[in-house]
Amino acid sequence: MSWRTVPTFAAGVLATLAVALLVRCRGPGRADSAATDRMVRWWAAVWLRAAGARVAIDGLEHLRAAAPCVVVSNHQSNLDPIVYLQALPLSLRVLAMHDLFRIWVFGPALRMIGMIEVDRESPDFRQIDQAAARDLAAGHSLLAYPEGTTSPDGTIGGFKDGAFIIAIASQVPIVPAAIHGTCRIWPPGRSAIHAGRVRVAAASPLQTTGLTQHDVARLRELARDAICSAHRELVTAMSSRTGRRAH
């Protein structure tokens, strides 16, 4: 096990407790505040610094121009949302899997800072759609992983429709984004943490103005194509820099 593992999780738990306490002290209904966004960004920075993750991001201009928007990304690691929460210049809410909300400390903290719980076993997604619509109307952006799970080998899988249904319903842009490197720092299904570099690339926004739910499949495939293209470029760039093949 890497020496970074225990210090990283210790720092993460302490930062989570601190944010949960601060949000609770501020009282109910404050998850929408700019102060909460700053606390979340600080929380993510603590995790990344402890893990030794060095993050670079391209395409920030696409994000600033599109907000509020739905950011959709490939999913390599549990570290991915932490990277996005720290690196993106957005008031960001994450569509997070139900299992994360069941973890001691993390679940209550996620709810307090306004993250949206997604239960794949539930047949009724209306509550998710309503929460997402409220956040977008309030000026927040959403981060979603259309693959629905992390990829064990970095290969980008098929996309589900949920994020695209939400974007069209609220008539906000989709911003495709690719991430690479997190699977080496915190491999999926494992707890060991290793220092490393992470690259993120945001592509041009896909507008949804005038689109209907009949356009979901086309929008989904356009986003997936953009993410796959951006991801290939990230893999090539990081491989050439390290002099070895990245995957």
Language-model region placement:
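N-terminal membrane-anchoring alpha-helices
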Residues: 1-56
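Catalytic core of membrane glycerolipid acyltransferases/transacylases, capturing the structured
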Residues: 19-29, 34-37, 50, 65-122
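A secondary-structure boundary/capping signal
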Residues: 59, 73-75, 96-97, 145-147, ...
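Glycine-rich helix-loop-beta junction characteristic of Rossmann-like nucleotide cofactor-binding loops
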Residues: 60-64
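Non-catalytic C-terminal accessory region of glycerolipid acyltransferases
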Residues: 126-247
